[in-house]
Amino acid sequence: MPATIVDYEDASVEVHRLVVGPVDNNVYIVRDRSTGQSVLIDAANEHDKLLELCQALNVRQVVETHGHWDHIQAVEAVRNAGIDVAVTSADAGMLPSYDQLLEDRSIVQVGNLRLATIATPGHTPGSMCFAVEGTPLLFTGDTLFPGGPGNTSFEHSDFATIITSIEDRLFAPFDAGTLVLPGHGAGTTIGAESPHLDEWVERGW
């Protein structure tokens, strides 16, 4: 199995991270310790490594935070290995193929893991975050990073929309200690980022 970074672990869950591809995407595998089953967040790249991880950690489901090219390069490979891939309807057209559509405020269950879906448009129209119930874990894709929101210079991106998503769907409902695990780079917490929202609005990015 490829060496991974363990970003979080407790009695019930562990989070493995592998950094892949030309723009250093974070691929997360969230494993339910009670059943050994896992969910993979963003089949980004380096499919050979991801397939090894999928086998070693018993990945049963892939969910995509959004449809940008750097987050989906291994989608075909994991589907060919028999693992279902889910994405929002708004971003589904960006993927080469998929199996399921994700809806806002729903639950993705793998083993005893329950991932709550949170629609956070702005970076893309169909961007989605995932919170693991009963843990402080929040996977934000390219919506929220240390120091601000994701890039909104792309076609179909919108700065005002991503700010609203962050304020209403992430900062308002989640505790300060919530761990933010983004699609690239290091993690942060809601408490470290939420005081800076007005600064981000003022600077415009």
Which positions does each model-derived feature cover?
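Active-site HxH/HxHxD metal-binding segment of metal-dependent hydrolases
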Residues: 24, 38, 45-116, 195-199
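Short Gly/Pro-enriched turn/cap motifs at secondary-structure boundaries
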Residues: 18-20, 99, 119-121
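Short, glycine/acidic-enriched loop or turn micro-motifs at the edges of active sites
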Residues: 34-35, 45, 69, 91, ...
